[in-house]
Curated annotation (Swiss-Prot):
This is 4-hydroxy-3-methylbut-2-en-1-yl diphosphate synthase (flavodoxin). The keyword Phosphoprotein does not apply. It comes from Pseudomonas savastanoi pv. phaseolicola (strain 1448A / Race 6) (Pseudomonas syringae pv. phaseolicola (strain 1448A / Race 6)). Belongs to the IspG family. Disulfide bonds: none annotated. NCBIfam families: ispG_gcpE (TIGR00612), PRK00366.1 (NF001540).
Length: 369
């Protein structure tokens, strides 16, 4: 039952990706990217639906050629969540997906080609109200910047980004967001800090090619956590060599830990020791699996003994403290005693009841407001 986040977010211009606001006073949007073959429409739609069920706000889809562009158009008709088309090199692909209803174009103006081609893409985006993401990556910096700096640096990333920002602004286009990604945490953080001071556009945060599920989660949590804690960032994507649904889960967990956005259960659990009166690890694994469908923000404490249990339980909506017998707290007050028999079943029941009660109360406040 913790309060609002103490973080003061950087002021930025608000843009819209489909129905999702990004920047300004909008909640930080959670993104992911499909890793299916875009030409396999059924598989890509199924993956997007899974991402949407996990709570994703925006999904990016790679569109490498014209066949994929046509597939993208069919995919767009079959899903509800806003879609970003990831496009490189061939400006005609951007023009085609704009015709097919894309919600955002992810391009690098530096590899689209001549000025007239960039202008054609910008005109198509402007005519249809489509925003653009300028995506700068340490692994694909322009050759002149590689020569100037010798290697990727925060300054090189920012110079590349500003070059493209100025390009769009010369074309009188302001409806864009920017990312400056690197796989090195320090480089990415430094680049975003520099860029945040120089532009007002919303920033898309990410540590690119972060790694597998565990290592990538840690890298992303460290890098994005540093930036988000400073108020930098308007939308995030956790890049993992894993099921894209895991990217969404990790993204929400990072935002929940900083109290920037709440969705589903925020578990507070001890690592367990010989004082535990029930199997904390097993209990947590079962609860997390059973309660993934709950979207209502709730703090649930699962503590194995009485050393820290009562204190943590009193701060949660639902708290379990190990003892003889175990004790359940609801809204900070002792509510009932539990034995280890059917412990998880009973705790799940109480959590679901509390979630329903909170959802009804929240809806009532919205209606009265």
């Amino acid at each position: 039952m913790h309060g609002e986040s103490p973080i003061k977010r950087r002021e930025s211009r608000k843009i819209w990706v489909g129905s999702v606001p990004v920047g300004g006073d909008a909640p930080i949007a959670v993104q992911s990217m499909t890793n299916s073959d875009t030409n396999d429409v059924a598989a890509t739609v199924a993956q997007i639906n899974r991402l949407e069920a996990a709570g994703v706000d925006i999904v990016r889809v790679s569109v490498p050629d014209m066949d994929a562009a046509e597939a993208f158009g069919r995919i767009k008709q079959l899903v509800k969540v806003p879609l970003v088309a990831d496009i490189h090199f061939d400006y005609r692909i951007a023009l085609r997906v704009a015709e097919l209803g894309v919600d955002c174009l992810r391009i690098n103006p530096g590899n689209i080609g001549r000025e007239d081609r960039v202008r054609a893409v910008v005109d198509a985006a402007r005519d249809r109200g489509i925003p653009i993401r300028i995506g700068v990556n340490a692994g694909s910096l322009e050759k002149d910047l590689q020569k100037k700096y010798g290697e990727p640096t925060p300054e090189a990333l920012v110079e590349s980004a500003l070059r493209h920002v100025e390009h769009l602004e010369r074309l009188n286009f302001q409806d864009f967001k920017v990312s400056v990604k690197a796989s090195d945490v320090f480089m990415a953080v430094a680049a975003y800090r520099l860029l945040a001071k120089q532009i007002v556009q919303p920033l898309h945060l990410g540590i690119t090619e972060a790694g597998g599920l565990r290592s990538g989660t840690v890298k992303s949590a460290v890098g994005l956590g540093m930036l988000l804690a400073e108020g930098i960032g308007d939308t995030i994507r956790i890049s993992l060599a894993a099921d894209p649904v895991e990217e969404v889960k990790v993204g929400y967990d990072i935002l929940k830990s900083l109290r920037l956005r709440s969705r589903g259960i925020n578990f507070i659990a001890c690592p367990s020791c010989s004082r535990q009166n029930f199997d904390v690890v097993k209990t947590m694994n079962e609860l997390e699996g059973r309660l993934e469908d709950l979207l209502v923000p709730l703090d649930v404490a699962v503590i194995g003994c009485v050393v820290n249990g009562p204190g943590e339980a009193k701060e949660a909506h639902i708290g379990l403290t190990g003892g003889t017998p175990n004790l359940i707290y609801i809204d900070g007050k002792p509510a009932q005693k539990l034995t280890n028999d059917n412990l998880v079943d009973e705790l799940e029941r109480l959590i679901r009841e509390k979630a329903a009660e909170k959802a009804e109360a929240d809806a009532s406040v919205i209606v009265r407001g």
